[in-house]
Amino acid sequence: MKPEAFSALLSHMLYEKRFGPYFVEPVVCGLKDDGSPFLCGMDLIGAPVYTDDYVVSGTCTPNLNGMCESMWRPDMAPDELFETISQCLLASVDRDALSGWGAVVHVITPQGITSKSLKGRMD
């Protein structure tokens, strides 16, 4: 399924439950037919936000937004992108007690998906 179609389906499903919503903030990422990235974030009632750079979601959104604005730049290599994502996530979750003890980072390229786990503070 194309990421554009999946994000539209998910948006409609969330909007249908708007009076008794699922308390989620989904992020849909993938590659379009031409190989360009597709990024979409939604709120709990399915209002989509399409972007070309990055999407943040969750309880540490303000911290993540600031970190990503300062560290992200266009046309990063996959390893450089992973390192940037990791630094942003770890710095942000350290400042937010509700964010959990780590993260899983998925880097999607035309060659495949690379997934790595990060461990954060455990206190």
Label each PLM-derived region with a short phrase.
Residues 1-123:
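Long, low-complexity N-terminal extensions
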